[in-house]
């Protein structure tokens, strides 16, 4: 594997983790939001990022890319709040499935992964510079 492949792989990982951090930020920002669909109001549905292998040519290894962004399948919460204008006839309001604790943990994980790939890039750059200085 060439050093340039290392740069491509680490760069793709940074890009993918950056997208994941953006989705997490959107989830947290919209945790209290509602969506109007077909004349009805619904709570915001959390999103999740799905990654997939982005293989190098003629290789079993590669970088990573965002395959898709899907709706989180965790159930919505029902909260008893009969004074809420969005409550049903029994007084329950459907609340978002955004879990701030899980989102924070996922944010820390994605940030650490991003930082680790920055270090990989720094190491690869250092190796390239040392390789270039061999001929001096």
From Swiss-Prot:
It is found in: Bacterial flagellum basal body. Pfam families: Flg_bb_rod, Flg_bbr_C. InterPro entries: Flag_bb_rod_N, Flagellar_basal_body_rod_CS, Flg_bb/hook_C_dom, FlgC. One of its GO terms (cellular component) is bacterial-type flagellum basal body, rod. One of its GO terms (biological process) is bacterial-type flagellum-dependent swarming motility. Keywords: Bacterial flagellum. The basal body constitutes a major portion of the flagellar organelle and consists of four rings (L,P,S, and M) mounted on a central rod. The rod consists of about 26 subunits of FlgG in the distal portion, and FlgB, FlgC and FlgF are thought to build up the proximal portion of the rod with about 6 subunits each. Belongs to the flagella basal body rod proteins family. NCBIfam families: FlgC. This is Flagellar basal-body rod protein FlgC. It comes from Buchnera aphidicola subsp. Schizaphis graminum (strain Sg). The gene is flgC.
